[in-house]
Amino acid sequence: MDRIIDTAATSEDEAIEVSIRPKRLADYLGQQPVREQMDIYIQATKARAEALDHVLIFGPPGLGKTTLSHVIAYELGVKLRVTSGPVIEKAGDLAALLTNLQPYDVLFIDEIHRLSPVVEEVLYPAMEDFQIDIMIGEGPAARSIKIDLPPFTLIGATTRTGLLTAPLRDRFGIVQRLEFYSPEDLARIVRRSAGILNIDCTTEGAAEIAQRARGTPRIANRLLRRVRDYAEVKAGGQITIEVAQAAMQMLKVDQGGFDELDRRLLHTIVEYFDGGPVGIESLAASLSEERGTLEDVVEPYLIQQGFLVRTARGRMATDKAYQHLALQPRERVSAFTDPEDLF
């Protein structure tokens, strides 16, 4: 399912992100607490001529975890090696990566929660002692040898910290959580991207795009490109607030950043199930969507923004959802009667 507001990166997103990715912390907009902390850690590390402590970065998709890893490596003045958890299938794959690192290099592992247990076992001594144990030979003749590694920094990124094993999580000396961006910070990001991509975008136009980007830079930059297309065909190329609003209407993205599927879900709960609670299977059947799509793609943002709640008896629309749909909240029996309401 292709959604303009999907947080998953498309091939176009990845290509554009490379060209607009900031290099320095000073250009990494938003996430002020993270920037301030990393600036201190990096300066102190460089002064001691050591490898930076291993870093775990977590948060929802599209907030800049990969970008931050590139910035950290640039500020340290070292090379960045990029890979992902699913790619490292065997212990030998990880060993090959680690033994090719230069002193103080940064190894970035995206989706680190998807590392296999066998690979994790190799990673533990590498992170703690800068050594790896490799098995040579097979059967009775097999033996373990230790290989010394240069000091390095591992940066792990994940959207699901709950899936990390405790031993792996405990080996990260620095843990940073990326939060959703404010509309103001997103507007600054849109203006910066517009400047790099030579897009004529007014301050008000950038703010309008940012308002509908669901707190996510990846979505903001994608919307910017689609609004640019609209502006070039319909409005002489300049993105004003009026042009941005017209483009968003064409894209069916409302002021809350909701698309048609978001609104259909809320409308269905409100109109057909009296605001809920309604089971996920019934909801999926009513919308002709798969359960997994609703649970993993649609619901998280609605829940995070307070438009939807999950209870033991099913999904319920909140008063905020009624207000967004310009409807009057109805009297409902509370669904919060089970001690496991939140699951």
Swiss-Prot record:
NCBIfam families: PRK00080.1, ruvB. Homohexamer. Forms an RuvA(8)-RuvB(12)-Holliday junction (HJ) complex. HJ DNA is sandwiched between 2 RuvA tetramers; dsDNA enters through RuvA and exits via RuvB. An RuvB hexamer assembles on each DNA strand where it exits the tetramer. Each RuvB hexamer is contacted by two RuvA subunits (via domain III) on 2 adjacent RuvB subunits; this complex drives branch migration. In the full resolvosome a probable DNA-RuvA(4)-RuvB(12)-RuvC(2) complex forms which resolves the HJ. InterPro entries: AAA+_ATPase, AAA_lid_4, DNA_helicase_Holl-junc_RuvB, P-loop_NTPase, RuvB-like_N, RuvB_C, WH-like_DNA-bd_sf, WH_DNA-bd_sf. Pfam families: AAA_lid_4, RuvB_C, RuvB_N. Residues 182-252 are annotated as: Small ATPAse domain (RuvB-S). It is found in: Cytoplasm. The RuvA-RuvB-RuvC complex processes Holliday junction (HJ) DNA during genetic recombination and DNA repair, while the RuvA-RuvB complex plays an important role in the rescue of blocked DNA replication forks via replication fork reversal (RFR). RuvA specifically binds to HJ cruciform DNA, conferring on it an open structure. The RuvB hexamer acts as an ATP-dependent pump, pulling dsDNA into and through the RuvAB complex. RuvB forms 2 homohexamers on either side of HJ DNA bound by 1 or 2 RuvA tetramers; 4 subunits per hexamer contact DNA at a time. It catalyses: ATP + H2O = ADP + phosphate + H(+). This is Holliday junction branch migration complex subunit RuvB. DNA binds at R291, R310, R315. Has 3 domains, the large (RuvB-L) and small ATPase (RuvB-S) domains and the C-terminal head (RuvB-H) domain. The head domain binds DNA, while the ATPase domains jointly bind ATP, ADP or are empty depending on the state of the subunit in the translocation cycle. During a single DNA translocation step the structure of each domain remains the same, but their relative positions change. The gene is ruvB.
